[in-house]
Amino acid sequence: MIFDEDSNSIAQDSGYMAVGNAYSNGVSYISMSDHWSKLTKPSSIKVVPSGASPNKADLIIEPLESGFALTLGNALRRVMMSSLRGFAVYGVEIENVLHEFTSISGVREDVTDILLNISMMRVKLSGMNSKVLSLKVKGPCEVRSGMIPDTDDCIILNKDLLICTLDQGVDFNIKMYVNAGKGYVPAVKRKSVNKLGDIPINFIATNALYSPIKKASFKVESSRIGQFTDYDRLIMSVETDGSILPDEAVALAARILQDQFQPFINFDETDEPHKKVDAKDTLPYDSNLLRKVDELELSVRSYNCLKNDNITYIGDLVQKTESDMLRTPNFGRKSLNEINELLASMNLHLGMKIANWPPESIESLSKQYSEE
């Protein structure tokens, strides 16, 4: 498959059209880091449980640059489904059974069905990559995975899984071999590589599904920063088998992508031209605090309320609590939500404690930042 896009189509898809290169004549300098540092990054990642199970959750990531939610969501979903490592039963030994095309007297399921059931058993190991699980049962009973006792280093996650059904007086002895891996490994592939002669003669390979992800999907919605609504919100819905949590699965997928992208970065960030160290670069707090509130895209009502309360800089604003703001005349919940969203986009919030505020020469420092 060939994927090809030019800059004009990307600009049109994003709702913008290029009008010329403002930097070609040396009017402004673009540092290497500007290509990524100037982009909007998510101010929050919210984990919302889906129901009572901790294994299902929605992760809400916003705000993102237009188009980024689809790009990131698709990459994260594919990596989660294909590349996360987990544990699975890859083979069994059943007493008096030499191959899978066998029926066992007194056992209602044939060996093929038993292997299919066992392949769906979910296991979590701690501090090891492999383990042999043993189970001895006497009928009549239903043999379920929960009959395998948990230990400090091994937990059966789906304890109600039916393995087989025994009639009166039937003994059922089985060993299950568990190891770590990724993706799906069919039994035929396992047989082709197990030619070392060190496995038991009655070892039967099983299909092994190692992925800890049961379901993963995503959707894209619009997000906003102030009055601008051309941003993305990414909502990822993840369900795991219980060996890891949904937010851990997304974090691992992101780390895999980070590692895979590393070879594409063919420059050293330390080679950038040395930038003059300004006083503003050594301030002990966020530079956004020096911006004036009239730079924010506030509604007229919200701006007038701040002005009447003598709030000039964002640093003045964030030191107010929500209760303080709601006591301001004509300032209501709608204005509060508007300000909270704007502050969150800058990784700020109401009720912050800022030492040594305001700084000396705040007016000149604020002007330097506005000109940057």
Swiss-Prot record:
Pfam families per the UniProt record, alphabetical: RNA_pol_A_bac, RNA_pol_A_CTD, RNA_pol_L
GO process annotations (BP): DNA-templated transcription
GO cellular component terms, semicolon-separated: cytoplasm; DNA-directed RNA polymerase complex
GO molecular function per UniProt: DNA binding; DNA-directed RNA polymerase activity; protein dimerization activity
Span list, region Alpha C-terminal domain (alpha-CTD): 280-372
InterPro entries to which the protein is assigned, alphabetical: DNA-dir_RNA_pol_insert, DNA-dir_RNA_pol_RpoA/D/Rpb3, DNA-dir_RpoA, RBP11-like, RNAP_asu_C, RNApol_insert_sf
EC number, as in UniProt: 2.7.7.6
Positions of region (Alpha N-terminal domain (alpha-NTD)): 1-268
Domain of life from the UniProt record: Bacteria
Key words, A-Z: DNA-directed RNA polymerase, Nucleotidyltransferase, Transcription, Transferase
Catalytic activities: RNA(n) + a ribonucleoside 5'-triphosphate = RNA(n+1) + diphosphate
HAMAP family for the chain: RNApol_bact_RpoA
Protein purpose: DNA-dependent RNA polymerase catalyzes the transcription of DNA into RNA using the four ribonucleoside triphosphates as substrates.
Complex and partners: Homodimer. The RNAP catalytic core consists of 2 alpha, 1 beta, 1 beta' and 1 omega subunit. When a sigma factor is associated with the core the holoenzyme is formed, which can initiate transcription.
Domain notes: The N-terminal domain is essential for RNAP assembly and basal transcription, whereas the C-terminal domain is involved in interaction with transcriptional regulators and with upstream promoter elements.
Family: Belongs to the RNA polymerase alpha chain family.
Protein name per its UniProtKB record: DNA-directed RNA polymerase subunit alpha
Organism of this sequence: Ehrlichia chaffeensis (strain ATCC CRL-10679 / Arkansas)
